[in-house]
Every structure is written in C-alpha cells, then in structure tokens.
Amino acid sequence: KNLPQTDVGGPWAIDAQITRGSYLIEMGHMTENNVDEWIAAAKSIGARQIDVHCGKTLRFGDLEPNLKAYPSGFDGVKRAVNKLHAAGLAVGLHTYAFYLAKESKWVSPVPDPRLGKHKMFTLANDLDDKDATVRVKESTKGMSTITGFLIANSVTIQIDNELIIFSEIETNAPYAFTKCTRGALGTKPAVHAKGTNVSQLRELFGLFNPDGDSTLFDEVARRTAEVYNDCGFDMIYLDAIDGAGALMGNHTPGYYQAKFIFELNKHLKKPALMEMSSFDSHFWFARSRMGAWDVPSKSYKMFINNHYIDNLTYAKSFLPRNIGWWAIWDWTPKDRMRMFPDD
C-alpha cells in the first residue's frame, strides 16, 4: 500500500500521452526574458517538452532560483512555466536528486549537522579562528586531496558550525590537515575546543549530500516536491541518483534511491512524468520512461546502434523507451571527436 501511485508511471506509463515525444534540455540558459526563444526552438524541432536542468538557474538541493535569471525569484519561474504551458509545452524539473549545492541553505552560512559525513576525527588541541593547521588524534592515512566530478572524496571538514577546506594532509603522527581555508563556503571562522568532533563531508559530482538515514534526506525530497507543485512543473528527472553509493549509510544504494523516490512521490500534488539516472525494480511503480543515456562525445553512430540494442532489453519493462540524449558539439574542445554533417 505504500508504493507510489501515478497514472503516468509504472503500469500506466505506456498509455500516457505525456510520456511520448521528444524533449529539449536547457542547461541553465533559459530565463524569464528569453522564454519565447526557447518555445521557438522547441517548436522548430518538434519537441513537446522543455527540461529545465538545475544547477545554474535553480540551485541543486534547495532549488532556489538564480536572481540573475529570475529577478523576482519563484514568481518569475512560475511565469516562465505558465508561458511554456500556454505554448503547449510540458516542463521538466531536472534535479540532482538528493545532492546539495555548496551554496545551498543546508550548507551555508551555517552547515546542517545532518550533512553526510565520511571519516570522523577528534581535535587534538584547541583551535583558534586563524589556525591554518587542524591537528587530529586519529590517523589520516589513506586520505587524499584529489577531488573531481566523478570522484567520491571531499577536502571539506566540518567542526561545529564552521566548514574548513584543507589543501594538504599530514599522514604521519602528529596527524593534521594543513594549509586550511577557514570559514569556507560562507561559514564563519570560530574557536574550537580540544576534543571537538572533526567530520569529513561526503561529496560527489562537486556537491555534498545529506546523511541518508537522517531527516534531512527526506527534507530534500519534500523540498523537490514543493517546488514541483508550486511552480507547476510536469516532469521530474532525478539525475545523479546513481550516485547513491556515496551516501554509504546503513543500507544498500538501491534502498536510498527508492526511499528518496517514494518520499518525493508522497508529496506530489499531481503525478509527475518521472525518469531517473538509475533503475531498480522498486522504481518501476513511479518511472515513466526508459532509455535516456548521457550524450556521446565520439562514435555517434555506434552509440545509436548500442542504444537501440539496449532498448530491446528494456522492452520487458513495459515502459516507453527513448533514444536520447543528444548534443550538437562545436569544434572547440580537444577531448572529443569532431561532429560531421552525417552525424
């Protein structure tokens, strides 16, 4: 009885009209002032939906609008969505699931104690508000300062209400985090007493995440539902949900993925056309479409062939399948093969 109930997902997805047709992903360039241009672009390629990719115009996690794009905040977002609806287009909210921007309200200016923690330490001595070296009692052996979009590692530690970014690590006793930036990410440098907890935050995709077993995890899901409801969105794409392994809580990644999806669906006022960047049998009841792959950067024709073969397998899911995503690459980057007219 606790399974998500939606007439555009699971057993009803294949008959729902909204699950058909192409969608245009806007990567943070649409504003309240240029919506007409996006409507024209969508119409020119026969797209029936515009997917608003969060990150630039809506902040990951708390989904607060960028005031440069929407000076009047959510009122401007609602006007943009209404204009797209008037043009006959559905509108998608493309989030990074439970991941949180480093500027979000749960991180800055006061970091939430429910943020996901990786390694835990104890201050070895009193720390004033200017010290650039944080000494800890426990070993730091095996820790790294290497971070990146696909690297599950963070150089940010939390002590009380302060975040500190370290540049180097002393892995031999006395153990320490060195060359530190105090009061990082808009927090306030402070004095901390010997014996205080020092927590390395969890990070992936350049974003923090909540403790998967905390109330913050559910709070992020409810916030996503709130913005979806208030702004009148029609679709939700839960990108980055495949990064649930970085939560490393008391359960498997699939548990946290399903937990987030179930909590989100409980608070939606209208059914959402829903996709996500991972799949498990527990998601099927809420999922509306299958087959979205990230854009290829080379071997475009082989990509289509492989995608088609994979979609044959997903025919057993009884969900509509697509063969996106696509991007038209220019000739600037050095790390991708050029796109030619027959691509």
Language model region names:
Residues 97, 101-182, 186-189:
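Autoprocessing Asn-cyclization modules and mimics
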Residues 102, 106-122, 202-219, 265-343:
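Glycan-recognition surfaces
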Residues 1-19, 28-36, 40, 334-343:
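Beta-strand-rich recognition/accessory modules
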Residues 2-13, 43-52, 76-119, 151, ...:
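Glycine-rich, aromatic-flanked loop segments that form ligand/cofactor-binding clefts
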Residues 17-120, 202-221, 225, 229-254:
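Aromatic-lined carbohydrate-binding/catalytic grooves of carbohydrate-active enzymes
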Residues 162, 189-202:
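Surface-exposed interaction regions enriched in Ser/Thr/Asp/Glu
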Residues 256-261:
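Long, internal scaffold/assembly segments composed of regular secondary structure
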